[in-house]
């Protein structure tokens, strides 16, 4: 493609499309936990949730439960799910393969109880 004035076509600069900040990435991930279907997917399709690193990351993300960070949350039920996941993971132990054990029931619990938790959240918002 040639330019009529002889100049090369403009390319997007990093100023026009900046990468998301760590704050934005973490906020997006935290809020995705409010989506029970996504959490179920994480716990059934991906083995990342059995990683001690993922356990540590979820624990680290609890700072979002406190102001001023919690004031940025649009879907507050995500904080409930974060605390729930961390509660389950506290009792997990690392096996000889370096994976977390003792979490086999977690996907089933999230899948079965998740819709009820979402309905309870909606009821709290309605009141």
Swiss-Prot record:
Keyword Transcription regulation: yes
GO molecular function ontology, one term from the record: transcription coactivator activity
Pfam families: Med31
Location relative to the cell: Nucleus
Taxonomic superkingdom: Eukaryota
GO cellular component, one term: nucleus
Residue intervals passing through the bilayer: none
Keywords: Activator, Nucleus, Transcription, Transcription regulation
A Gene Ontology BP annotation from the UniProt entry: regulation of transcription by RNA polymerase II
InterPro entries: Med31_sf (IPR038089), Mediator_Med31 (IPR008831)
Miscellaneous section: Present with 468 molecules/cell in log phase SD medium.
Oligomer status and interactors: Component of the Mediator complex, which is composed of at least 21 subunits that form three structurally distinct submodules. The Mediator head module contains MED6, MED8, MED11, SRB4/MED17, SRB5/MED18, ROX3/MED19, SRB2/MED20 and SRB6/MED22, the middle module contains MED1, MED4, NUT1/MED5, MED7, CSE2/MED9, NUT2/MED10, SRB7/MED21 and SOH1/MED31, and the tail module contains MED2, PGD1/MED3, RGR1/MED14, GAL11/MED15 and SIN4/MED16. The head and the middle modules interact directly with RNA polymerase II, whereas the elongated tail module interacts with gene-specific regulatory proteins.
Role this protein plays: Component of the Mediator complex, a coactivator involved in the regulated transcription of nearly all RNA polymerase II-dependent genes. Mediator functions as a bridge to convey information from gene-specific regulatory proteins to the basal RNA polymerase II transcription machinery. The Mediator complex, having a compact conformation in its free form, is recruited to promoters by direct interactions with regulatory proteins and serves for the assembly of a functional preinitiation complex with RNA polymerase II and the general transcription factors.
Family: Belongs to the Mediator complex subunit 31 family.
PANTHER family: MEDIATOR OF RNA POLYMERASE II TRANSCRIPTION SUBUNIT 31
Official protein name in the record: Mediator of RNA polymerase II transcription subunit 31
